[in-house]
């Protein structure tokens, strides 16, 4: 606020000075003293105003001009003016004190000097003060401000064990120093977005009870040259004054990217900042008691000099949680929500493979919002299922009008997926089938894995292929080949990619054998070539296409045979989907056993609740979900 006030004062003084200069230069027309005397003698002057040695003259025609009286006594002038009956006026001399004269004379200079001193003092300050570009933007949090502990971090037990030594060192450094051991100078936490890297860093500071400096990698480099390196120096100077302490640099790949990489060349500001960081972390001057923790989801782009031992001695992988980790994370977030007794965290964890900690937190929040919309006192399993479906596939599009024929076609399509997925060997169990449009999909078939899959066998892949093609085959068997819709476009895309990877990467072709036919050339910005080298002949490429086609045809034929043998179940499942729109695991088992179908949970709830569930604006799609396919209706 003070800086803005000073700025406006400076602008006002400049405008006043300009106005006065303009005013003084734009007064009445000036002429010589001889003309004035001539006009007086000819009787052309009606009034004369004397202001020191300046005379303002008014002529008989009303025009005015000014002239300056020379420093000579003209005793005859007054007599001539009076004889011609000219109105004579005078201005008294302004009597100013000595101090007033000095103030008026020196005020502009003193004012400018004061403004200059003000800005110079601001430059010596830190933080966000004026022109303090070289000061660190790191925010320091004291131990009283950090309330996060290891109890708030779940799903990454291995990572917590890795960083546990840091906490012990910060609590009792002599324990390690007496034995001659050295604590790691830096820890690089690597993992996908949302896995809890920042949360884990805050938990380390909360457990160790030490100051915590936090900054983003993008906060170093500015528009001015040298600012990034200056901020790095200032950050480490502040950290040394508060040692022992932690420095957390989030998204370090913004400043620690590999030097000399990319399509361009030459030196840039980012490299200068990185060089200064390398020196500060492991240079001639030590930084004992200062531990640097950095987080990134792109470790492959970091400079090797930054990740070597002595700077970041230890890399801690904070990966996506497994089913047990997801259960623990869900329980942590459910503490803040009033959850009903029917909510099973393990069931939710099984149905959310590939979810990060942030995704699970969003799942719990969405379920709470669903319950609040219908004025429930607790969050039930129904709200969690609706929240999971919304995150996986987007909100329900109940306003989308589908004809009876479109509903029937979609029901046959999804029933084909469900029947083949239920009967092929080693496939994930069918969890839910719906024909309610979600996002870009007209219908969805959900499969619930029994556990996390670290690797997948050839039999599982081929079962997946049969299931993917089953939706298209169901339409073919019911309506004929000429009436197949474009709903299977995404199924075909996914199946083709799986079949091609089986041949070119995973060695599941007897003819071509376990040979890699594709190579990852890396990214262009890492200094690698833009051109992709061809590692196979045209004959080999033709053989690959033949093997891919053989795998697809084999599983296509198997899916057709399964559907032909179970046409009665296909028709019954279609009828159930048209009636209920969504069927769950219990109804699917009844249909597969050819038993009467009971209504699914939530069937018959008030329309107001259904509308409240449907009125959702978030479209947070997640491609790594347990959804088997999405029937894209856009051609």
Swiss-Prot record:
GO molecular function, a single term: ATP binding
EC supergroup of this enzyme: hydrolase
Stretches in topological domain Cytoplasmic: 1-4, 119-635
Xref: SMART domains: AAA
Biased composition (Polar residues): 607-620
All ranges on the Periplasmic side of the membrane: 26-97
A GO cellular component annotation in the UniProt record: plasma membrane
UniProt record, GO biological process: protein catabolic process; proteolysis
Primary location recorded for the protein, binned into one broad class: membrane
Active site, renumbered: 414
Protein localization: Cell inner membrane
Span list, region Disordered: 593-635
Residues where Zn(2+) binds: 413, 417, 491
TM regions (residue ranges): 5-25, 98-118
Cofactors that this protein relies on: Zn(2+)
Pfam families (alphabetical): AAA (PF00004), AAA_lid_3 (PF17862), FtsH_ext (PF06480), Peptidase_M41 (PF01434)
InterPro entries linked: AAA+_ATPase, AAA_lid_3, ATPase_AAA_core, ATPase_AAA_CS, FtsH, P-loop_NTPase, Pept_M41_FtsH_extracell, Peptidase_M41
PROSITE patterns in the cross-refs: AAA (PS00674)
Oligomer and partners: Homohexamer.
HAMAP family: FtsH
Protein name: ATP-dependent zinc metalloprotease FtsH
Organism, as annotated: Haemophilus influenzae (strain ATCC 51907 / DSM 11121 / KW20 / Rd)
Gene label: ftsH
